[in-house]
């Protein structure tokens, strides 16, 4: 028996598959590049502007956002931005000192890093909510990358290499933003970041026990086992005075966090908490001569603005491997954290941030920072949350913070030299407790077990191995999952929803009707060399499992975004196998790119235009007509 069905070209006007001439290579290449690097098409409004002067103005506003919002600035916005800027400064001072200590660099570098970068971000940043500064995870990762031996024996060289790593971070981030390679950051999934931040919080919490117990000797390793071993081995050094002060500070800080959660309008109580700890700690340590009672302090902090550090950059080939590793890994983490935080707060205000512009801003911030005695900065969650709750309207709040930090560096820095290390440890511990997102981990467990596995691999990898190994393992699991999605694409059998022309997955909609004589299958991903064998075997298995004989296979390709030659040959092979069983293959709604390749490879000629339809309903009607009119030959 030879089955022929009504050609799609005889369908009502506008209902048939469009077999127009395929686009040229140049047109397709341009389209691909646009969708890969410019999916948001940021330059379209600029290109449509007829006036050359206005076009130049818009282009300048795109690359330097301050020219967009500053002309519209008014005193009403300034009032809110000044309040927000002063509030985040109260957090920037203790965090700057604390995180510099975490990175094993002089505390004054932490203050320097809260002075220059905010000005740079205010000029080039696109988020109205982000407050920039140093972060705990990257601070610890930098120290871990260069190692205990260098930190202990060559502190000056270590500081120079940190400035160099910051330059590498900035150049890397700028290049990613300029080349619009934000897609690379997407490999750090939400699950990976949740687990990584949680694991990092655990090891940072445990490391702060050195300050809480007043220990002199302590390991620089970051895994849980080594840290606990070091604490127990040095228990003879435990100081009750330091422990008592640390517990009091920690209880106070957690109380302020509780007040903020219970009464959101009192957010400033939590924001001022770390500064209160620093001020009270300084006063008490000065009055009782804390160093004489076993309470270590920060030590001398000199007055003055950031000295230039461009002459300190070290490109010795012996250290370049470590420098590039520290710069690129911390750069990726800083980007993922900063962009994710900026976007999450922008959503709350119905605003948008441009990820690629943020990368450029972060990159310039770190490049200029590396020349002015700063180390890596990004958008920390705690500071951004305070900035948002304080009512910030524009990036001007970062300018206000920068001005306040300038005053601190010029006049107040030496006063913070009495800050007890136990107070800084309490500040860090309080901040880290908020980074362990138990609710999100439980949510991942309920919704998606594989996402939970990715999260836990980062969490335990960071906690028990190291930060970079934990990150690599988690990203590895994420990539394996993505490859599995590609290699094992979703396929489903469709049935008609009763009394409608809609066709849906019969497993999801058990009431949907199957029709005798044909089977409708839907492919939900690209078909190419990595999954073509699976696609072929899965389709043939669907057909073998049919209890009744079938005459038509209807293949819905609306979910297939692209196909390669291996995929094309697979479809032809399926057609040949089905042909030997007197089963015709019908193609439904091939996407533009897929249809172009089908035409160029002569697939359409081999299968026949009459077996290609725009919709499932059109194909079903044609098959039904054929089944009711064609009689088998005797």
Swiss-Prot record:
Belongs to the SLC26A/SulP transporter (TC 2.A.53) family. Residues 1-25 are annotated as: Disordered. The chain crosses the membrane at residues 82-102, 105-125, 131-151, 159-179, 196-216, 240-260, 266-286, 322-342, 359-379, 396-416, 421-441, 459-479. H(+)/sulfate cotransporter that may play a role in the regulation of sulfate assimilation. SUPFAM superfamilies: SpoIIaa-like. The keyword Transmembrane applies. Residues 1-12 have a biased composition (Polar residues). Pfam families: STAS, Sulfate_transp. Keywords: Membrane, Sulfate transport, Symport, Transmembrane, Transmembrane helix, Transport. It comes from the Eukaryota. GO terms for molecular function: secondary active sulfate transmembrane transporter activity; symporter activity. InterPro entries: S04_transporter_CS (IPR018045), SLC26A/SulP_dom (IPR011547), SLC26A/SulP_fam (IPR001902), STAS_dom (IPR002645), STAS_dom_sf (IPR036513). Coiled coil: none annotated. It is found in: Membrane. Residues 103-104, 152-158, 217-239, 287-321, 380-395, 442-458 are extracellular. This is Probable sulfate transporter 3.5. GO terms for cellular component: membrane. It is a multi-pass membrane protein. Residues 1-81, 126-130, 180-195, 261-265, 343-358, 417-420, 480-634 are cytoplasmic. Its main location: membrane. Residues 508-623 form the STAS domain.
